C-alpha cells in the first residue's frame, strides 16, 4: 500500500525500529501497514510527524488526551512537581487529593487504590472480587478488552482482535477455565450461565460501552438487568471504565447510565497523559486489600506523584460545559458520517455516546462481538488511509473507537468533514 504522503523519515525510522523493538512498536495497536508514521510532537488536537505532516487526531493516545496534547496547565503543574521529586516510595498528600476527587465523582467510589495502568486495575479488581466472595469464576463478555493479563485475554478486542489473535497463545487452559464467555446485550445468556454455575461466580466484568471492539452500546435496560441479577446472586458487578471513566460524564458510565456498580476500574483520562490506573468501589470491599485486609496488591509506582499531579489538574477542567462541548463535536461528526455514507450509498452503521464514536462498514446493527467481526475491515482500512492522506488520524482498526477533545474546534471539524467526504466518495 503506497500512501500519497511524504513519509520517508517515518519509513527509515520504522526499519531501524524493527531491529530493536518487537514489530517496530511497543504496543500492537500502533502498528499498521505499510508502516506507522513516527510522531515528533503533539499540540492541542494535532500530531506532527517526522516528515512534517500535520494530522488532526481523533485517537488521542487511545483516549487520555481529553484536554488536548501538551496542555499548558498540566505541563506547568507536572514541572513544578518534578522539582519536588518524581517518585517517593512513601505516601504524599496529593494522593489523598486525587482520591477525594475520584470519590466525589464516581458513584460507587468510597475508597481508592491507585495503580499504574488499566491492566493492573482490572487484574486487581478481579482478584478482589474473588477474595471477597470466595468464588473463582468470572463472567466476561465476548469482544471486551480488560487489559493484557491472562484471565481476560480470551475472545478479546482491541489490538488482539485487529491482529488476528483474540485468544492469545501462551495462556494455559487452566488459567482461563474459570472465565465464562457470553455475548454482550444478551440477557438469556447471562441467566443461563449464572444458572449453570450457581454460587460459583465471583463477578461480572464489563465495559459499559464496548470501546475496544469499536463502539458497541448497551441496549436499553441491559445494564440495569445486570445490576439486578448480580445483586440477586451475590455476584459483584465490575464496571471497567478505563475508557468511559471521566469520558461520558463527570461520574463516567455509572452517572451517565444511572447504574451503580460494586467496583470500577479507571485509567487513561485519570492520568492526564501520564501512566495511572485505579480500582475503586464500596468501602466494605476495598478494605479487603492489604494492608487493611489480606488481599494483596502493590506497586513501586502506585500513586506516583507526577501522574497524580497530572490527574488532579486534568479533573479540574472536566465540568458540565466541557462535557456539553465535547459531546456536541462527536454528535456533529457522527451525523455527518451517517449523512455522507447515505449520500454515496456506502453501507455503514455509526454509533456514538458522549465524546466517543465509531463507524462500522456493516449493513446490520452492531450489538455484539460477532456483529462487529462481520464488518468489512478491508473497507475500513481504505477509509482510514484516505483520511490519513487528507490529514486526519483515527485509530487504524475497525475495532477501536474515536474520541473528541476540547481542542477540536469548528475549523478542525470542517477539515475533518471534508476528509470524510473524500473518503466516502472513494469507497
From Swiss-Prot:
Reaction catalyzed: (S)-4-amino-5-oxopentanoate = 5-aminolevulinate
Might you give the EC number(s) for this enzyme? 5.4.3.8
Q: What is its main location?
A: cytoplasm
Tell me which InterPro entries the record gives: 4pyrrol_synth_GluAld_NH2Trfase (IPR004639), Aminotrans_3 (IPR005814), Aminotrans_3_PPA_site (IPR049704), PyrdxlP-dep_Trfase (IPR015424), PyrdxlP-dep_Trfase_major (IPR015421), PyrdxlP-dep_Trfase_small (IPR015422)
Protein name, as recorded: Glutamate-1-semialdehyde 2,1-aminomutase
Signal peptide per UniProt? none
Q: Which GO terms describe its biological process?
A: protoporphyrinogen IX biosynthetic process
Q: In which pathway does it act?
A: Porphyrin-containing compound metabolism; protoporphyrin-IX biosynthesis; 5-aminolevulinate from L-glutamyl-tRNA(Glu): step 2/2
Biological source species: Methanococcus maripaludis (strain C5 / ATCC BAA-1333)
UniProt keywords, alphabetically: Cytoplasm, Isomerase, Porphyrin biosynthesis, Pyridoxal phosphate
Q: Name one GO molecular function term.
A: glutamate-1-semialdehyde 2,1-aminomutase activity
Q: Which family does it belong to?
A: Belongs to the class-III pyridoxal-phosphate-dependent aminotransferase family. HemL subfamily.
A GO cellular component annotated for this chain's UniProt record is: cytoplasm
Q: What class of enzyme is it?
A: isomerase
What does this protein need as cofactor?
pyridoxal 5'-phosphate
Amino acid at each position: 500500500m503506497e500512501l500519497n504522503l511524504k513519509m520517508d523519515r517515518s519509513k527509515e525510522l520504522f526499519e531501524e525500529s524493527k531491529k530493536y523493538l518487537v514489530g517496530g512498536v511497543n504496543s500492537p495497536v500502533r502498528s499498521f501497514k505499510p508502516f506507522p508514521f513516527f510522531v515528533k510532537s503533539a499540540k492541542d488536537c494535532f500530531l506532527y510527524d517526522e516528515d512534517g505532516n500535520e494530522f488532526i487526531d481523533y485517537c488521542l493516545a487511545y483516549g487520555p488526551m481529553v484536554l488536548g496534547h501538551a496542555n499548558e496547565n498540566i505541563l506547568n503543574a507536572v514541572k513544578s512537581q518534578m522539582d519536588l521529586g518524581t517518585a517517593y516510595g512513601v505516601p504524599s498528600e496529593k494522593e489523598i487529593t486525587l482520591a477525594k476527587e475520584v470519590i466525589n465523582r464516581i458513584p460507587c467510589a468510597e475508597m481508592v487504590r491507585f495503580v499504574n495502568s488499566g491492566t493492573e486495575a482490572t487484574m486487581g479488581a478481579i482478584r478482589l472480587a474473588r477474595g471477597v466472595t470466595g468464588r473463582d469464576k468470572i463472567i466476561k463478555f465476548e469482544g471486551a478488552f480488560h487489559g493484557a493479563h491472562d484471565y481476560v485475554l480470551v475472545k478479546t478486542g482491541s489490538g488482539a482482535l485487529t491482529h488476528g489473535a483474540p485468544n492469545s497463545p501462551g495462556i494455559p487452559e487452566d488459567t482461563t477455565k474459570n472465565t465464562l464467555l457470553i455475548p454482550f446485550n444478551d440477557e438469556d445468556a447471562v441467566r443461563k450461565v449464572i444458572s449453570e454455575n450457581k454460587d460459583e461466580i465471583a463477578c461480572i466484568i464489563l465495559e459499559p460501552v464496548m470501546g475496544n471492539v469499536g463502539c458497541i452500546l448497551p441496549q436499553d435496560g441491559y445494564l440495569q438487568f445486570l445490576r439486578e441479577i448480580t445483586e440477586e446472586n451475590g455476584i459483584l458487578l465490575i464496571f471497567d471504565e478505563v475508557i468511559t471513566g471521566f469520558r461520558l460524564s463527570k461520574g463516567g458510565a455509572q452517572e451517565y447510565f444511572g447504574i451503580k456498580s460494586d467496583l470500577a476500574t479507571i485509567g487513561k483520562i485519570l492520568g492526564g497523559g501520564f501512566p495511572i490506573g485505579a480500582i475503586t468501589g464500596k468501602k466494605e470491599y476495598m478494605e479487603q486489600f492489604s494492608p487493611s485486609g489480606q488481599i494483596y496488591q502493590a506497586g513501586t509506582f502506585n500513586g506516583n506523584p507526577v501522574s497524580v499531579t497530572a490527574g488532579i489538574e486534568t479533573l479540574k477542567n472536566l465540568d458540565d460545559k466541557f462535557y456539553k462541548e465535547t459531546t456536541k463535536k462527536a454528535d456533529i461528526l457522527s451525523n455527518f458520517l451517517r449523512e455522507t455514507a447515505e449520500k454515496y450509498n456506502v453501507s455503514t452503521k455509526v454509533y456514538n455516546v458522549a465524546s466517543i464514536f465509531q463507524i462500522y462498514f456493516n449493513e446490520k446493527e452492531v450489538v455484539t462481538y460477532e456483529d462487529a467481526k462481520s464488518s468489512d475491515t478491508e473497507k475500513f482500512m481504505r477509509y482510514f488511509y484516505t483520511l490519513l492522506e487528507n490529514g486526519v488520524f483515527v485509530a487504524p482498526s475497525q475495532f477501536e473507537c474515536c474520541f473528541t477533545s476540547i481542542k477540536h474546534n469548528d475549523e478542525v471539524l470542517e477539515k475533518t468533514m471534508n476528509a470524510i467526504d473524500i473518503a466516502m466518495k472513494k469507497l
